[in-house]
């Protein structure tokens, strides 16, 4: 209801002032979001969630788009999250408050939330109405409304300290409320329903007047007691940077706020009185009708039950019962814990987003549905079990899920399958699809209970046994090219054949030590189906150290090529069989066979002609094979730069050898010698078809080509879904809105004036430079290689619980309530930390100046020591030291670079005295023009100066 009123009011206002700009920005740019909010409002209305809206404090923003930003898309604060609470505690500054009319109309629109309140006082009003005491019911209603109205006035005009003190008295108010209600019950049972009519007023007061005052004071007192529900919503989300949202005197002049807040409270009072009179005019005839039908006896017991229940719920009112009757969820997330959340399908990712980074609405349905139907993927939607309704629907209009599915179930995320790598691999094109074998459908259950299973387990095992034959060659290739796979002791051997795991719970005999699987990032090939990695037991730290010590004793840190060759062969024979004449196992030999030239033994060959298979050349090939094994074995410690350097050197050596060979052949022809015939080289495509790994030289000089082939064959390899979401969120227009409103506005909401000395003013200038330097580091960090989202843990596939495979420290990630919260927390991580160091936001002990005084929120921290010479703390926490020294030395991949979505010119926020609103600008704008008296300490006679404090930097 409040959302609909805000939308109507915003439409009327903008159409009156600038219709062209309104239609372009709000319907063309923000139209889909508005339609989505309307649909969400209809769903919430059908599920009776609007009952909870009536109880909240109704200080909402009149601008529809601002309300949508705060409630659905933008994280309003890191501590409180994207909850509607901050939106209700904020008075809009985006709409000009001309002549104070907007706050007045806003107060009239918000008055129903204070009038229509289900409370103990409301029950008393109905009781007095049932006794045909109309004037008593009116007085009780007015007392209740007046108490609620006074609390709102106290909050708006800066009396939040008084509200906080009253909040600490909530236990006593509840005890008093319960005792008073039980007193009424006692009098009700002993005297009867008409005990109020027999009471007499003190000091000779007229009984009618005394009863009226007593009833009015009763409603007022109970209304204050029941304000603990509102206090909980007021005090709970407070944080140091939200204090100005309550008292509102940090910018502008006092006159502006008096006019703005005064118009709002007047409109709230007028609307409440008018609506209350309308409600009473409807209830009084209804009660008269009920009295004639003699329903007072039945209504009496129900009212008594409601009174006793409502007064016995601490920190909650009747809204707790009406909005949480099914599951009794926590108070802070009653909208987030429902399946009707507007961001229901934000976790779904298009199957082609890894190539385009954007989704085209016109092609989403055409590309997703055939791909889904070809794989027999039909989701099944199940609602909450407590509701008891079920329905099935095809997601024909939604993008298909192509990566790891997650969902918020309660407070945690639950993966849809045991192994995420298996899921996004199985959704690729199945090699057995054209042979008459189909896969079982994927069943998706809402909410928080996803699972993915295969019906034919035998088919999965057979495919695993067939496809695992090439795992050694593939793993070896990936170790050399990608340098992120470390596979040792993958499967057991039985009579020379590689055997797969029959069951996850079966005993798995490993010929090599299992520490190769512990604390390593193991990336499985896409064709490996069975989740056999999770069957390996955990190892204690002591066992790891003992195994590592034993391994070091067996193999010294520095070995010659012959020693390494001997050690490798002795261990490889156990796993892969007897080595061949090249010194390599047979499983690895097929990829290293070189083409021998067909030499005619009868022809005389000049000794000057270089024989490609001479002793030196053969030694070079053997050395190359040993180097390849060394790289494969120690790929974990070989950086990519070393591999690229070796590849370039090897390519240069082969080029020179080819030139020398051609020169020798040319000289032989000039001398009339017979040149041996050689077979023509196969093309690159034929080489790839005949031998996917190619010759040993292709590991080096064709390194980039191999990477392209790998991307074509396995497009999902090594590409995490959160990187796709990062590009999608950063490319959205709301990201810029978030930067302008939530970041710079928070930094700019420093006090507009202070009693400062010259030393304090110098410290202020220092902190201005510090914050500017910090924001410059953020802009450098945006194009840095390190600007990526959370990386998987080192033992990604070894974690027993899929929830533990991401972000070992749980810094942000899955604690965020939405995708935008996740991006916001990751992008601006450390911003508040630096600001708290520069401008201490609370009265806690100052850790950076243990000998200095304590500072408040609006005071400055002392100047840092200059003899240290370390300005690294002004940089972002995730930027390494080498990047700080030379930011432009790194050239990250295009897939890891975040596109800059805003200009490098920072935005400032300030108070415009003409428009009487906070405005965003790229130029320096003073906050106010009022002259402030300044007291200089250290003088016997105060010297008053005129001083103007202006906003001179982007962050203070």
Swiss-Prot record:
It comes from Nephroselmis olivacea. It is found in: Plastid, Chloroplast membrane. The keyword Transmembrane applies. Signal peptide: none annotated. This is Uncharacterized membrane protein ycf78. Belongs to the ycf78 family. One of its GO terms (cellular component) is chloroplast membrane. It comes from the Eukaryota. It is a multi-pass membrane protein. Residues 592-609 have a biased composition (Acidic residues).
